[in-house]
Regions:
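Cleft-lining beta-strand/loop regions that shape enzyme active-site pockets
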Residues: 55, 60, 128-134, 155-160, ...
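Short loop/turn microsegments at loop-to-beta-strand junctions
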Residues: 176, 188-189, 413-415
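Residue-level signature of catalytic and energy-coupling elements of molecular machines
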Residues: 46, 141, 178, 239, ...
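Terminal targeting/pro-maturation regions of precursor/exported proteins
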Residues: 1-153, 480-487
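Short, surface-exposed glycine/acidic/tryptophan-bearing loops
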Residues: 78-94, 163-166, 337-346
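Stable alpha-helical structural segments in soluble proteins, enriched in small hydrophobic residues
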Residues: 67, 144, 148, 198-201, ...
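Conserved functional hotspot residues or short segments at active or partner-binding sites
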Residues: 93, 410, 424-488
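Acidic, polar loop-rich interaction surfaces within structured domains
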Residues: 369, 384-387, 393-433, 437-439
């Protein structure tokens, strides 16, 4: 097996990160609004917020070292050069990089003031050798700061074209109502939201977008293509598409605000045994109300047991994870969190007087993360139900969004870790299913006879042990009571 040089791999990741930044249309539009004074003010605000609120803030020496390294690497990055209209020779790049090395060697950084002095020196060097605007250097010091933190912490600018950036947990978005991912030859439509412009225009999951407003996607990055699909409410969008079942076709639609349902599917899986099914795509603000409606719909249809599908669910709001867990747990700890500050430490327990006693199977996979893991661990460790599938992602940290004063945007920082009801640290560990279903990936959102997770869940859903768990969870727990581990 070939061995990858760790240093080479790290340099590749660094270049990929720089390319991602400078091919991101939202970030580029934001940077066009900056001057050096606003950029430096933003650096100070972000630095102070990291110092005060990040769970494990890095030193200014680490941040400066990362910033200078990124700046030197950026000089030879084609996306960076293109975004900043730079025409550089190999000799010019090398001279600049040597000058940055000189700045680094002379740096003695212990404070934000020291870091700002190094940033000022770097601005002079970049202006002299590259003709680079000083605000770009300041932004690289901001990115250098967040790059030294955990992978979930980041600066999130608002899109100056549309206003506050859409959050993954928001219940509506302006656009055409599709979820997409890159694919060979275009952009794959993974999901079409009900009642959105794309749904009304006849788009289907599996369609491939091959041109946008008459422009081919060849040579265009995924983020650039997605940016073109987005746009203000009331604006028109034309798409060229391919569908496996027929010839290429074109559609035109008007962008507007589209509601996003976090509960994406509610149905009876097995009418004979009255096994209900709910799929939750994220833990959003309205998920609790949507879940109530789904449960009552299934209850009125005669549901006797429930399969709750969290596969592919990346998480969302901590408060929503607690609310949903509380619907099924009559007692017991749900989750606890611990951070640097007292305000980041808490423990939440079940407190509802009326809960659903329906026997419960929860599906998870390697892409179930964060709030999904909180819910699954609460159900598992309180012996309320059975977890089926594959080991979850293991995110285990809490992020807080801090609105910024100097610019329109936010700073997302990791402020705490969360722990399971048994006080088990979830970061890096995740949830191991009670029943493991090996070597299976759900390729489509549509359930079918080949879904091994569903097959395993159906075999469990009507077992008397599951009903007993639902009943016993309301009483003092019996040590060691659980359904035996199994493999399917």
């Amino acid at each position: 097996m070939p061995v990858v040089d760790p240093e080479v791999e790290q340099l590749q990741k660094q270049q990929q990160s720089i390319s991602f930044r400078y091919s991101n249309p939202v970030l580029m539009r934001f940077m066009q609004t900056l001057d050096v004074n606003r950029a430096v003010t933003l650096y100070r605000e972000i630095s102070d917020m990291v110092d005060r609120r990040h769970m494990k803030p890095t030193s200014y020496a680490e941040r400066v070292e990362k910033s200078l390294g990124n700046l030197a690497a950026a000089a030879e990055n084609s996306d960076f050069q293109r975004a900043n209209s730079l025409r550089l020779s190999a000799a010019g790049i090398e001279t600049f990089q040597q000058a940055i090395v000189g700045v680094s060697r002379q740096a003695n950084v212990r404070s934000r003031s020291d870091a700002e002095q190094v940033m000022s020196q770097s601005m002079s060097v970049a202006r002299q050798y590259l003709g680079l605007p000083s605000e770009v250097v300041a932004m690289e010091f901001i990115f250098g700061t967040t790059d030294t933190l955990d992978k979930y912490s980041a600066f999130v600018p608002d899109d100056v074209r549309q206003g506050p950036s859409a959050s993954a947990v928001e219940d509506s978005v302006v656009g055409i109502g599709v979820e997409v991912k890159p694919t060979e030859g275009g952009i794959l439509v993974e999901r079409v939201l009900p009642n959105g412009p794309a749904h009304e225009a006849g788009l289907e999951a599996g369609d491939v977008i091959v041109n946008i407003d008459g422009r081919t996607l060849s040579g265009m990055s995924f983020s650039q293509a997605v940016d073109m699909i987005g746009g203000p409410s009331g604006s028109r969008l034309s798409l060229g598409l391919k569908r496996s079942s027929g010839p290429a076709f074109a559609v035109s639609m008007i962008r507007r605000r589209v509601d996003i349902q976090s509960v994406s599917e509610v149905r009876m899986l097995d009418s004979t045994n009255s096994v209900g099914y709910v799929r939750l795509d994220k833990f959003a603000e309205k998920s609790s109300a949507e879940m109530d409606a789904a449960l009552w719909k299934l209850h009125n249809a005669g549901m006797k047991s429930l399969v709750f599908d969290l596969r592919g669910n990346p998480g969302g709001l901590l408060t929503t994870a607690i609310e949903l867990s509380d619907k099924f747990l009559p007692q017991g700890v749900i989750v606890s969190t611990r951070g640097r500050l007292a305000q980041d430490n808490m423990s939440e327990s079940a407190k509802r007087s009326r809960t659903w006693k329906v026997p419960l199977v929860v599906l998870v996979d390697e892409n179930s993360a964060s709030a999904s893991e909180i819910f699954a661990a609460a159900i598992q460790e309180n012996q309320r139900g059975v977890i089926v599938g594959r080991k979850s992602y293991g995110k285990g940290t809490v992020q807080t969004h801090f609105p910024l004063q100097s610019v329109s945007g936010a700073l997302r920082l990791t402020t705490a870790k969360f722990y399971s009801p048994n006080d088990r640290e979830m970061a890096g560990a995740g949830v191991t299913p009670d029943v493991v279903v090996d070597d299976f990936k759900l390729e489509s959102r549509q359930l079918n006879s080949g879904d091994k997770d569903i097959q395993a869940a159906l075999r469990l859903a009507s077992r008397p042990e599951l009903a007993q768990m639902a009943e016993r969870s309301a009483k003092p727990q019996t040590p060691g009571y659980s359904i035996s581990d199994g493999r399917f």
